[in-house]
């Protein structure tokens, strides 16, 4: 489950 990847992705 990508949680931090999603946060870094939108950054």
Curated annotation (Swiss-Prot):
Keyword entries, A-Z: Amidation, Neuropeptide, Pyrrolidone carboxylic acid, Secreted
PTM annotation (Methionine amide): residues: 11
Disulfide bonds: none
GO biological process annotation, one example: neuropeptide signaling pathway
Cellular localisation: Secreted
Main location: secreted
The organism's place on the tree of life at top rank: Eukaryota
GO cellular component: extracellular region
Transmembrane segments: none
Task performed by this protein: Tachykinins are active peptides which excite neurons, evoke behavioral responses, are potent vasodilators and secretagogues, and contract (directly or indirectly) many smooth muscles.
Homology family: Belongs to the tachykinin family.
Protein name: Eledoisin
